[in-house]
Amino acid sequence: MKEGTAIVAGLLLVGLLLQFSMGPLDWALFLWPANGITLIVLIIALLIFYLLRRRVYFFSFMTTIQAAIPAIAAAALLTLVMGVARQVPADKPAADLIGLSKMLNFWPFILVYFWMTMLVGEITIKQTARFSWRRLPIITSHLGLFIALTCATLGSADMQRLKMYCEKGQPEWRGLDAYNNVHELPIAIQLNRFTIDEYPPKLMVIDKMGRPIPYKKPEVLLIDDYFKQGSIAGWHIQVDKKIEDAVPALLAGMIKNMPKQMQGMLHMDSLGMAMKKGGYIKSSMAGSACAISITATKGNAMKKGWVTCGSYQFPLETLKLDNGKALVMASREPKRYASDVNIYTQDGKNIMTEIEVNKPYTVNGWKIYQLSYNEQMGKWSNVSVFELVRDPWLHAVYVGIYLLIIGAVGMFLTAGKKKEK
């Protein structure tokens, strides 16, 4: 055990020296075919180590439990640190001086995991060379772990993660990486329609500084389809009328005869809102938003008016109460949003589908995620932002994980049979 501990301590020390002298490891050095060559060299080296195990003590030591336990303990400890320390995105520098916030590029972490991977590979070769059906579960488990570790690390260099900004009606085939470099892709996406489902509007009371009341735990009224009246901050609130898609009557009158191309260019400012008359009317035009007619009472005081969160076409409107307070509608929160798209591929596919948040679509090795949209335009957004991810080594990682699970189940079953005997 002392030798294994000494090796791990040496790897940690060497890793720290490399970290401070060379900086974090750049996995881009292992882009294909470098990662494939590295994997082949590693396997050949492990085979040579096994053949020379009787001549070189170190090679035979690699297959012992005295080598495995310190390596597993160090890897587990570093993984725990990785889970506790907040990790920064791959394109950002480490947030701390040592580099614990970018653990996947942290030399001590990499060297310890590399050492553990070598031990797993060497034990797999040893078990395979002494093959028996009784050992099949443990061979399968070790082989799966070796495949998962090597392919997940070496394959990370080939993973592509790109953002694509698609405007309605225009096919787009270019994506941006984390450094804003443009990449032309073998697939194109055309946005046909963006849809969004929103949570019911929320009303709250704010002070003259714009802070919700009460300060520590603001009160909120959820105005769903069944809400008629309620109380907030000492005021009794009654909903007289609710229009889910509304625009100021004055704005609707101004643009009704305009061409559609010009309607989106007209915006009602705060001055126009102050001068407006006629309240709000139901409208299907782009830029409409929820508007609620409110009667607020407190003792003998009564306030009536409209409340809306506004949109890119017109600003929000509040209901003035007393002592500088106002009743406001918070910005609507999205419950679900998705894009109806056409996906074109170089091999002639034309796929019509819907891409929803957390429900990616997979085509030709690419996973397409709904990432964002034009939040200023909200549900009327004419732009969808997609994230496209391609990981050519992912299937190999899955194979390793499945083998690991199969081996674990096999060991559990064989252990049960031994107990019965």
What does each of the following model-derived ranges do?
Residues M1-K421:
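Solvent-exposed, non-transmembrane regions of integral membrane proteins
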